[in-house]
Amino acid sequence: FLVKKRLAACCNIFPVESISWWQGKVGQNKEAVLIVKTLEKNFQKIEKEVKKLHGYKTPCILEIPLKRGNLKYLNWLKEEVG
């Protein structure tokens, strides 16, 4: 849905097994990690969309600044969501 809305140029979804401390005990759950390839300006819109759909009260939504990358890929990304 983020790609269709032009908020992301590409998304990757990975199934994972998570172990975390939650509400006083260790829990283990099957989850999915979503990597959204986009521009910084889209973060707040993406955060809002993910929170609407996510099943957790406190989903992990992080912005990881990019230091370097393939220039052709970065130009493509800007063209798609810029």
What are these regions (language model features)?
Residues F1-G82:
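Positively charged, small/polar-rich N-terminal and surface patches that mediate targeting and assembly
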